[in-house]
Structures are given as C-alpha cells and as structure tokens.
C-alpha cells in the first residue's frame, strides 16, 4: 500500500519521539532515564502513565489523560500547601500565610486555564472516549477530595485565629485589624478561584455532553445538578459577611451625584455607623431622597 509523503514524514517523526534523542549541546542521549533530571523527576515512569499509541481509542485521548493527570498533580500541591497554611495560621504567622495564599490562588486559577485545553476537543470525539471511562466522575477525583478536606481544615484554623484575636468576620470589615482584613480577602481569592474552576468544569461539560435534566453524567446524575455545586463556598462566613454588611448599609451620609465633596473627608463616617451629627458635613444634607441604583 502506498502512503502519502506527508504520512510517511509524520510516522517517522512519531517513531523518533518514542526513542531517546541526542542533545547536541549536552552531547548526551536524553530519554534513556539515566540523566539526573530524568532520575529526579522519574520521567520514564511519568511519561509512561498515558495510554500508548496503539491503545488509544481516539487521538485526543492523550490530551484528555494528560490534562486530567496534571490537574491531579496541581490539586495535590494545592492541598499540601493548604495544610501548611493551617499550621501558619495556628502559630499566627500571617505574613507567611499571606505569601502561601497567593501561591494557592495561582495554582487554582491555573486549573481553570488548563481545562481550556479540553475545550478544543469536539463533542463527537469525546463521546468516543467516554465509552472507555466506566462510571468515572469528577467526584471520584482524589485531588478534588483532598483539596476540599484541606480547605475544611483551613476554615477551622481561620475560626481559631479569630477566636484568639477576639474578632469576627463582620467586625473585621467594620474597622477591624488590617492584617486580618487582608487575610480575609486572600481567603476569598482562593474561594473565588475554586468556584471559578468549578464553573470552568461546568462549561466544559456543557460544551461536550450538554447540561439538561435528561442528560446523565457517567455517575448517573443529571448534568443539571452541576450548576448548584459551582456556588458552594469553601469559606461561607466570608460571603455571609457581604450579605450582612449590605443588610445594615445606610444611604445617609453619602454624596448626591454632582454635588461638591470639598471638606467632607473630615466628617466622613462609616456606611454602617449611626447617623452623623447634624451639621458635621453640610454636603450630606438631603441625600435620603437621592436616586437609587448600583453600578
């Protein structure tokens, strides 16, 4: 059988990639598993964890496996970093915790970006791969379950910290210590990134198999239930504080659109404090009838 030149070149290249390659700069063969880099990272084992060329049911199955395996590794790292966060909060090491929280946020945000690679797979291709996945679902992910468990521990460590400092989340946002407010915001960053990842997964499901009461995931549940999971918070008290702040918000003391604000900083008041003494800032007069609206 005659093959096109293009096919021959591709086949030859594919075979070359499956064998050790000579690096002219190092003057060594890479891929034999003998070099320090390969030994330390266990690359022979790592690169053999995916189905082989003749085992794949579709070309995109390699991408599917690589992305999911990478997600598990990142979730493992995020979980272990979160355990360190628990230790840091318990010893009041807030500077160290702040730096580590930034790392966790970047890891979790990266999870969402990685899922975008899977969006390049068309639904008909996924339906072929799906036949070989058994009843597997994201709920069975070790990394997902590890991170949820670690986050629960972090939430408890946060509560212990607030108890030691005699603070509440609501009190922190009403003029509490700046270091704790910063911590609250960074914890919320983690939570928001996590929910963003769940949303990215939801969109991936929607794009590949559809979201509807009639569409069942491999675990037998309707894909429609995924929508509710996206907004389940890791740190509920931080979100509840927003609701409480808004519930106690007062319009009085603001500025009418277009009115002069000169001199008002000296008499500025909290949006949640009792009304200002009459005359403290003349520009505040008559604002209760100002037009309402949020941006």
What are these regions, as identified by a protein language model?
Residues 1-295:
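Surface-exposed peri-terminal alpha-helical interaction modules
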């Amino acid at each position: 059988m005659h093959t096109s030149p293009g096919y021959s070149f591709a086949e030859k290249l594919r075979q070359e990639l499956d064998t050790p390659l000579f690096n002219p700069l190092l003057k060594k063969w890479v891929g034999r598993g003998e070099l320090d880099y390969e030994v330390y990272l266990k690359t022979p084992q790592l690169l053999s964890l995916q189905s082989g060329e003749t085992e794949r049911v579709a070309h995109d199955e390699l991408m599917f496996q690589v992305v999911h395996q990478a997600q598990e590794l990142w979730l493992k790292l995020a979980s272990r970093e979160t355990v360190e966060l628990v230790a840091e909060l318990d010893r009041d090491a807030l500077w160290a915790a702040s730096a580590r929280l930034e790392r966790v946020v970047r890891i979790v945000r990266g999870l969402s970006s990685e899922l975008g690679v899977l969006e390049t797979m068309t639904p008909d291709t996924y339906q072929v791969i799906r036949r070989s996945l058994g009843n597997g679902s994201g709920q069975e992910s070790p990394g997902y379950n590890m991170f949820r468990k670690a986050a629960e521990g972090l939430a408890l460590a946060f509560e212990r910290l607030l108890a030691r400092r005699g603070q509440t989340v609501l009190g922190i946002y009403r003029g509490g210590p700046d270091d704790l407010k910063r911590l609250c915001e960074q914890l919320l960053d983690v939570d928001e990134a996590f929910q963003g990842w769940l949303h990215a997964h939801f969109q991936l499901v929607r794009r590949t198999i559809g979201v509807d009461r009639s569409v069942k995931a491999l675990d037998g549940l309707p894909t429609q239930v995924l929508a509710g999971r996206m907004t389940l918070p890791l740190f509920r008290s931080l979100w509840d504080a927003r609701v409480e702040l808004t519930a106690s918000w007062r319009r009085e003391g603001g500025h009418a659109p277009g009115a002069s604000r000169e001199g008002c900083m000296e008499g500025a008041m909290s949006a949640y404090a009792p009304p200002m003494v009459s005359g403290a800032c003349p520009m505040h007069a008559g604002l209760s009838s100002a037009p309402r609206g949020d941006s």
